[in-house]
C-alpha cells in the first residue's frame, strides 16, 4: 500500500495509469463494488478521499492519499460481517475520517445478527487491543 501511495503521488513510469484508475473509482465508487458494498459506502462517506477494496475471505484494504494513511485487515475466520465494525473503529482511533463522515457511514451499517425467523440473536462488536 505504501508503494500505491508513492505511485499515486510521484512521477513513476505507471503513475498516470495508477491515478486514472484510482480517480475513476473515487469519482464513481460503484465501480469498485456495486451500489451496496461496504467499500462503495466508505468511498462515498469520505467524499472520494479514501480508496478501499474488500477482497475474498474477510480482507479489506484502504488508502487515504492525502493523509498518506493506509491499512489492511484480515478477519481470521474469513467472514465479512466483521469488516464494517473493525474499519469504523480503526478509522475512529486513527482519525482517518471526520466524526460527521463516520456517523454517516455508521448509520448505513447493521450490526445486529438475526436468525432465519428474523429474530435478533446477537450483535457484531469489536474488542481492540
Task: Show the residue positions of the predicted features.
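Structured C-terminal helix/loop/strand segments within mature extracytoplasmic catalytic/sensor domains
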Residues: 2, 6-129
Amino acid at each position: 500500500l505504501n508503494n500505491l501511495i508513492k505511485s499515486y503521488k510521484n512521477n513513476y513510469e505507471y503513475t498516470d495509469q495508477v491515478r486514472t484508475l484510482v480517480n475513476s473509482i473515487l469519482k464513481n465508487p460503484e465501480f469498485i463494488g456495486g451500489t451496496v458494498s461496504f467499500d462503495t459506502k466508505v468511498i462515498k462517506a469520505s467524499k472520494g478521499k479514501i480508496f478501499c477494496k474488500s477482497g475474498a475471505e474477510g480482507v479489506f484494504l484502504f488508502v487515504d492519499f492525502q493523509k498518506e494513511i493506509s491499512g489492511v485487515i484480515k478477519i481470521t475466520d474469513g467472514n465479512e460481517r466483521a469488516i464494517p465494525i473493525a474499519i469504523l473503529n480503526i478509522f475512529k482511533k486513527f482519525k482517518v475520517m471526520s466524526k460527521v463522515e463516520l456517523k454517516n457511514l455508521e448509520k448505513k451499517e447493521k450490526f445486529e445478527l438475526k436468525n432465519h425467523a428474523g429474530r435478533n440473536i446477537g450483535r457484531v462488536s469489536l474488542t481492540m487491543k
